[in-house]
Amino acid sequence: MSKRILMCPPEHFDIEYEINPWMHVSDPVLPARARAQWQALHDIYTRELGWQVALVPPQPGLPDMVFTANGGLVVGGRLVLPRFRQPERQGETPWFAAWFAQAGYTESLQPRHDFEGEGDALLWNDLLFAGYPWRSDQPAHRELAAWLGVTVVSLQLTDARFYHLDTALTIVDEHTVAVYPPAFTADSLAAIRAHVPQVIEASTADAMAYGLNAMSDGRSIVLSDRATGLIECYRQRGMQVCPTPIDEFQKSGGGVKCLSLELRPPGG
């Protein structure tokens, strides 16, 4: 199944502040390397997998706008805009809102509570797994359920290094997710297992390599080239595995999924 993805070129990507444990202004981005890694991901989507990629223009002064996953959530053609917790990222919202409006997304909601888009909300079949509390508030989950008409399963994250849900959980296919168990409370891990027949447990090494920050269509999966255990696991499952370097973006706490927002059509 071909996906449609929203990305943002990394023209202004850099470490200008520290808002998560990965970010250190003393460890700056190497711009040429970041551009090459972003382009490699873009080319995997478009050339290897045949997915469609739309681009939102990068804006000066918004270095993390490259992480489009936080720019919204699209389910069934309905849009949820982010309400960023960190002041450093709040300026991104009008630019994402303008892009979505121009693209024809006329039904939109911005929650009253903090919510950071697809980074904290992953759709698995007809369930929406939603993370909290580092960047999104649990009360926002009720707003998502009402607006999108889906069942929301709230998952509490426990480790600040895995501050968005998409850093600790991958939607692999309609039967399977991959998780890093130490990133969740016992109750949240039990909730995942109660709903999903197959749960792959990632090692600490693979989780720290941002191997769970991945994109899958059920047959093909794109993930960090340093997550060697998960790469082998997916290959043994018969999937097309597309490893790619993302270490420049991990300096800012981002990876493959952070750089990618899925644009689902009505009914999807």
Locate each region found by the language model.
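The feature marks the mature, well-folded catalytic cores of soluble enzymes
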Residues: 1-268
